[in-house]
From Swiss-Prot:
Keyword tags: Flavoprotein, FMN, Oxidoreductase
Co-factor binding details: Binds 1 FMN per subunit.
GO MF annotation list: (S)-2-hydroxy-acid oxidase activity; FMN binding
The organism of origin for this protein: Dictyostelium discoideum (Social amoeba)
Residues in FMN hydroxy acid dehydrogenase domain copies: 26-384
Family named by the database record: Belongs to the FMN-dependent alpha-hydroxy acid dehydrogenase family.
Pfam family, one: FMN_dh
Catalytic activity: glycolate + O2 = glyoxylate + H2O2; a (2S)-2-hydroxycarboxylate + O2 = a 2-oxocarboxylate + H2O2
Binding site for glyoxylate: 52, 158, 193, 279, 282
Region (Disordered): 1-21
Active-site residue list: 279 (proton acceptor)
Function of the molecule: Catalyzes the oxidation of glycolate to glyoxylate, with a reduction of O2 to H2O2. May use other 2-hydroxyacids as substrates.
Gene3D superfamilies tied to this protein: Aldolase class I (3.20.20.70)
Listed name of the protein: 2-Hydroxyacid oxidase
Amino acid sequence: MENQFKNNNNSSSIETSNQFSNKKTNRLDSFVSVSELHEEAKRLLPKMAYDYYASGSNDQITLAENENAFSRIKLVPRSLVDVSKVNTKTRIFGRDISTPILIAPWAMQRMASQRGELDTVEASKEFNTIMTLSSLSTTSVEDLSSATNGNPGWFQLYVFKDRKVSEELVKRAESIGYSALVLTVDTPFLGKRTADFKNSFKLPNGLSLKIFEKLMLSNLDGGLNQYIATMIDPSLTWNDLKWLKSITKLPILVKGIMCPKDAELALQYGADGIIVSNHGGRQLDTCPSTIEVLPYISKVVRGRVPLILDGGIRRGTDVLKALAFGANAVCIGRPIIWGLSTGGKDGVLKVLNLLNSELQLAMALTGITNISDINNSIIWDQNKYIKL
């Protein structure tokens, strides 16, 4: 039977704005999962670049758990529900998007493709989703704004020891069309990333941190650990969130929340959104997976601000589970890098198309037709049925 969950104009069963599958057939058509794209990216990328993108901290226990925890969560199939039309459209900060799958900030994307962040932002625009640009980008904010006609998405920010640097970045991003700030709060120091240490990681010749060129801060020759230690302020507190809100009108999402108490503090100090994230398993090893802590943070947030899960998403069923546990959306990082490495812009679109199609199928098989109808009743809980 032909799969009805392909995102194309010929399918009346699916409402979607994505038309990527109308493009001519190419080698990307042979990839049917994110894991296959991962293997291809591993084959194509130089070892130092691949290790930077793929590795976690210490023994990489949290890195593995981010993915493995999803497999322990079971979904409940439903029958005889009209699922002839499944719609993944949603809204965040007043913007209508085609999918709850957002693109996480990821540094130095021109190690993955020649155009790097330009490929990614153009794919996000075509798919009608949101990309967050990393502060450690190898493409300038101005170039990305131009490529999207002044609507490049969200901007990820570290607070630097020199607050003037952070303030200038905020003003610069706001002036050219970025619609939200993503404040990363889980990196007072860089996690112990063994692979980067062994590789003496630094940017390849010809690449630089473009965002900082005007500030004469783009040189990474001393290595990432030294750069972070020199630039990022480990004395950051919740009062700095208040300061940040005082210098911008943009909504601010706090990224790196893994503790319910921190979620409450984020709300108290004015966060406009919360991203549950452990930095892709690259900071504190042996901390829980993000999907494990999401339900507890959702109980704190109670729908007051957008709640986003980051980490471990590799299948559309993972997206559905995150939404069922209370997330409004998810962010994907490494899958985007694997697509970017394999096929540039079209590779990123391939990843988005794969995951969104899988999400649509999972929604249909659990009897759901709209994102707003997803709740935790689709999560198998033996205790609910043990007395039946």
